[in-house]
From Swiss-Prot:
One of its GO terms (molecular function) is monoatomic cation transmembrane transporter activity. Belongs to the AAE transporter (TC 2.A.81) family. YbjL subfamily. It comes from the Bacteria. It comes from Escherichia coli O1:K1 / APEC. It is a multi-pass membrane protein. One of its GO terms (biological process) is potassium ion transport. Its main location: membrane. This is Putative transport protein YbjL. Residues 200-288, 292-373 form the RCK C-terminal domain. GO terms for cellular component: plasma membrane.
Amino acid sequence: MNINVAELLNGNYILLLFVVLALGLCLGKLRLGSIQLGNSIGVLVVSLLLGQQHFSINTDALNLGFMLFIFCVGVEAGPNFFSIFFRDGKNYLMLALVMVGSALVIALGLGKLFGWDIGLTAGMLAGSMTSTPVLVGAGDTLRHSGMESRQLSLALDNLSLGYALTYLIGLVSLIVGARYLPKLQHQDLQTSAQQIARERGLDTDANRKVYLPVIRAYRVGPELVAWTDGKNLRELGIYRQTGCYIERIRRNGILANPDGDAVLQMGDEIALVGYPDAHARLDPSFRNGKEVFDRDLLDMRIVTEEVVVKNHNAVGKRLAQLKLTDHGCFLNRVIRSQIEMPIDDNVVLNKGDVLQVSGDARRVKTIADRIGFISIHSQVTDLLAFCAFFVIGLMIGMITFQFSTFSFGMGNAAGLLFAGIMLGFMRANHPTFGYIPQGALSMVKEFGLMVFMAGVGLSAGSGINNGLGAIGGQMLIAGLIVSLVPVVICFLFGAYVLRMNRALLFGAMMGARTCAPAMEIISDTARSNIPALGYAGTYAIANVLLTLAGTIIVMVWPGLG
C-alpha cells in the first residue's frame, strides 16, 4: 500500500498541525554550541519550510492558539498586575508611546526613501512590528480614504504583501534580540527579577528548603532539674531560646499537654517539637538525659497545611500578633497573590494571604479556624471559571470606539488579556475560586504559543517567495530597522530616563511590541514570571496605540509629498 504523505497532510489539518509541532519541538532541542534553538524558533522553521511547499492550515487554529496563550499570560500576571500597574502605569504608557511613535516615524521615513506607496509602507510597519492591529487600522482607513477603486485595490494588495514579507523578519529578529539583548547590559535579568521581588515583597524563590518539625522525647534528669532552677515553662522561655516547643509531658504514667505554669520534675518524660536545628540548640542538660522512645509520647501527627487568611480578627494584623508558636504551630511560608514573601514579624496580613503552617493536626486545625480556613488543593481545573472568563474576554474584544471617520476596537487579544488578569487577580484574593493548577496553566500556555507559531509559519511560507523580487532586499533592510531600532530606543529611554527595573523593562518592551514568543524568552532568561507583569502592563496600551498608528500613517502619508 502506497501512502501519499503530501495528500495525507493536506487533507487533515489536525495531523498537519501536530506533525509541525512534533518536528519543530525536536528541532528546538538541538544545540549549536552552547545555544539551544528553543521551541519557538524550531516550530517556526519547520512550519516555514512546510509552508513553502504549499501546506496550509485553518487560520482559526492560529487564532485559537494565540488567544489561549494571551489568556494564560493574563492569568499568571493577574495576582500582582494592579499593584504593579498603579505603581508603574505612567512608565508603561510612556514606553508604549516611545515604541510605537519611533516605529511610525522610521517607517514613514523608509517608505519615502525607497519610493514605496502607502500600502507597502503601512504593511511593512505592521509586519515589522508583528502587529495585526496596525494592519487592521491601516486597511480600514484606506477603505474610507476616498481613493479610486483601482488605486485602492493596489494599495490593499501591497498592504498584505508588505505585511507578509516583513512579519517573519520582525518576529525572528525580535526573538533573537530578546535572547541576546539582555546579555549586552551589565545587570542580568535574573538578578533584576530577584531585586524587584525583594523590593516589593514578591519573593519568587520557591525552591527554598523547608524542613518539617520533628519530635524527640527526653527523660528529665538531675542536670535538667538543676538547669530549670524551679522556673515554670513560661519563665524558662525554651521556645524563645531554641525554637523547640514542649508539646507533651508524661508524669506518673499520665500524658498531659502542659501550660505555661508547668514546672519540670525529676522523672518526667517530655516530648519536644521543633526543627532539626532547633533541637541542636537545646541545652546539653536535655540531651544528656536518657532519650525516650515511647509510642504514646511520640504519637503525634505532624501535618503541613496552607491556611488562607480570611477572618476579620487576622486581616490587618501583623504576623507576630498571631502568636502561632504559642499554639504549638510553626510558620514555613507566607504566600501573597501566589508569590512567596519573606517571613517577617512585621508583615501585615491581607485577606487571601496563604500561611503554610506545620504542627500537630489538631493545633493546626484550631489555628486555621481562628484566622481563616485550610486551602484544599485539587488537581482539577475550575473549567467553568476558565471558560466564563474566556467568553468575557472575547466580548470585551468586540467593543469598538468610533471617532469621526475612523474607529478602533479593543481586539480579542487585549480583551482576553484583561479577562485573564481579572481571573488571576480574583483567584489570588479568593483562593477557593477559579483554581488552575500551575502545570495545567503552563501546558495550555505553551501549547497555545506553539500552535500560533505553526500557523504563522505555514501562512507566511506559502507566499513569501512571490514577493522576493525587486523590493525584497529593501523590505529585509526596512523590516530589520523598524523591528529593532525602536526596541533599542525604548530600552535606552526606559533604562536611563525612567530608570525602570530591567526585568520589568524587558517585559514591558515585549508588551509594547505585542510579541508573545519574545516575552516567553525573556521570562525564561529571567527564570521568573516577573517580566510578564511588565508585558501585561504595556500590551493593552500598545494594542490601542498600534491601531491608531495604522490609521495615522495612512492619514499623514499624503501630506509628506
